[in-house]
Amino acid sequence: MTTIPLFFTFDEHYVVPALVAFHSLLAHADRQYRYRLHVLHPGISDRARRRIASVVGRFDHGEVVFHDTSMYEAELASCGGKSHFSKEIYFKLCAPTLFPECDRIICSDVDVVFTGDVSKAYFAYPDEDFYYAGVDTILPTNRLPLYASFDKEEQHWLAREICANFLLLNLKALRRDDMQRRMTEYYKANYARLPFPEQDCMAIFARGQVRPLSMRYGVSNVYYRVNADTTPFYAHCLCLPADDAARRAEFKAALADPIQLHYIGAEKPWNSCGVPKQGVWLRTLWEAGQTMYYIRCLPGILRQKWRRYSLRRFIGKLMRKIKQ
């Protein structure tokens, strides 16, 4: 039986969403394959690991392996947290050496619900030379002014970057071209000015060596707020057809039948109310048998949210005073 490897990076604060993500992934995965879920973590508790293993263990085609990354703390001491991002994202760039036994691997965030089978993505582009495959930007974005300090060539590729919430990594090609060393050095040297650190590094260094996956592998929950008949699309989008009618038809089809539903931004279905597609996440939480565990964790989840919210408000006020 072919084993499909996947890896995820998160800390103790994301254990509840990870339980939902893992249950939904395995519930919808093609059972002719085995799925090895690698968890890269900075020392999550034994209790959390046992709970994750219990959820994965309900599926005979799934297994989970834990990798403690706390040994890298000194290496990343210069990289603080960014909003709802964390240092764990750094390890998306380290997959070539973290998984020497793999030629390919899927990487996914855990603020997601899987509603379809991911296995076909693992076998995409079998005869092509590429570094990454994923879903690129679908709708117009206001992030490009954030890259004013980058040179013109870097801005060209940053405008065409793929989203890092679901990626197929061609580890063989990344190793061959020493991409891990190049990207991690750049990451650490430029962390303070990278709005989306690992995603930006991939865009700058992978350049033309990326391939589009179907939009179904990365449907953001905020897409359900737009009018699919009238919304404009991002100029450099490759995941959808160029023809407007065909593009809208495929966009609607992806919304109706996503493989991965991604909850973007700081407002998550487990820490906020009124989040688009929150009901899907809560229903999957129930199906995973983790609703009572979530309720027990909720006070800590809300404390974490408000700590980050207060920090963002403080930084915002500080920046406004500096500009006065």
Residue ranges and their predicted role:
Residues 15-30:
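Histidine-anchored nucleotide/phosphate-binding helix
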Residues 2-4, 10, 164, 171, ...:
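A glycosyltransferase accessory/donor-loop signature
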Residues 55-98:
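Active-site-proximal specificity loops/subdomain of glycosyltransferases
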Residues 105:
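Short aromatic/hydrophobic "clamp" motif used to bind/position activated sugar donors
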